[in-house]
Amino acid sequence: MSDPHAMQRLCGLMRKAVQDYEMISPGDKIMVGVSGGKDSVALTIGLAQLRRYLGFDYEVVAVTLDPQFDHQAVDYSPLAALFARYGVPYEVHRTEIGPIVFEYRQEKNPCSLCARLRRGALHTAAQELGCNKVALGHHLDDAVETFYMNLWREGRIGCFSPVTQLDRRGLTLIRPMLLATEHEVRCAVKEEDFPIVKSRCPADGVTVREQTKDFVRERCRTDHAFRQKTLHALQESGIDGWRPVHTGRTSNPSPKEGMHHADAEL
């Protein structure tokens, strides 16, 4: 079903997250790590559009680290054309991450090594471009899944933070789409007909996260407020960085509100 306001709704949720957690300041230069998937593409365009509503200016640049799985470079020209329309400079860095992970190292857990290599390369690229912040495309589903993965696999209560300081790098990681569900991101991308570059990772779709995603999806069939309840628990749990900076403002005042988001309009 078509939703002509999907992108506006997503930008509203991004604006709320940015304000609740003070993610962006005047003069910031923000780099978005673009994989080519729906999340990073939506994040890039959302940040570009938010410049009209936040009341101050900041720069947005986008970088793709092509892992070159099977030694094959990917064509990212559709993304380059899209970002150019929104005034976002875009670079593609060809890397050997794919061959290192799947051929030279032949890791039993390829996702862990791949994530470390990509993270290091991404942070280096941000420093080289003179950026002080890196925006990541994690949404609410990612946070919920990470929370339960940590609980089940490691027996601990924890999750990545909305804002993370990397003191040694002089960088700050921000996650502006944290209040939006994956469905809301998908609807925005579909409605705007943004181009997507499909992942060619050999491990795509067979990870532990995919299993956790299935669990969350199943729970939401019987409890539509499951994601929002988990978000509320994260914000009230005392986990570093999760309580909104502005006292008295939470992104989900009551789990009973289900899938409705407060103050999400631009």
Describe the role of every protein-language-model region.
Residues 1-147, 153, 183-191, 259:
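ATP-dependent adenylation/nucleotidyltransferase module used to activate substrates
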Residues 4, 8, 41, 116, ...:
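Electropositive phosphate-/nucleotide-binding environments in soluble metabolic enzymes
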Residues 22, 26, 156, 160, ...:
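Residue-level signal for secondary-structure boundary elements
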Residues 60, 133-134, 141-218:
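Catalytic subdomain that performs nucleotidyl-dependent activation
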Residues 67-69, 97-99, 164-167, 180, ...:
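Residue-level detector of flexible, active-site-proximal loop/helix-junction positions
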Residues 107-111, 136-138, 179-183, 221-225, ...:
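A general structural signal for short secondary-structure boundary/capping elements
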Residues 115-126, 163-169, 216, 220-236:
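Short, basic, helix/turn surface patches
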Residues 194-266:
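The feature marks non-catalytic terminal segments
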